Amino acid sequence: MKWIVIDTVIQPTCGISFSAIWGNMKMIIWYQSTIFLPPGSIFTPVKSGIILKDKEYPITIYHIAPFNKDLWSLLKSSQECPPGESKITNKCLHNSCIIKICPYGLK
């Protein structure tokens, strides 16, 4: 089954992410990974992680739940990344970020 990413919230210091996705219904997945699932990406879950753009990536999926608008709003409001100051300097202020490539193009 293919899943389409609608939106993603990341916590850069621990690699925890939440994505609103569409499969056979709208869901929220809670996972940990060193990759970013940008909106519009299409992936297939497999036993060892996911397949994204014909490449397998390890991720740990902790929980999948039906989409809840209030929960998603809460997750979005507590998002650490990108911090507002970074938009001005183009530099990431998270010295301990474990995401390999910044999804926001920061350095």
UniProtKB/Swiss-Prot annotation:
GO terms for molecular function: anti-sigma factor antagonist activity. Induction: By magnesium and calcium starvation, via the transcriptional regulator PhoP. GO terms for biological process: cellular response to acidic pH; cellular response to magnesium starvation; negative regulation of protein catabolic process. It is found in: Cytoplasm. The keyword Cytoplasm applies. GO terms for cellular component: cytoplasm. Signal peptide: none annotated. Transmembrane segments: none annotated. Its main location: cytoplasm. Keywords: Cytoplasm, Stress response. HAMAP family: Anti_adapt_IraM (MF_01199). Inhibits RpoS proteolysis by regulating RssB activity, thereby increasing the stability of the sigma stress factor RpoS during magnesium starvation. May also be involved in the early steps of isoprenoid biosynthesis, possibly through its role as RssB regulator. Belongs to the IraM/RssC family. This is Anti-adapter protein IraM.
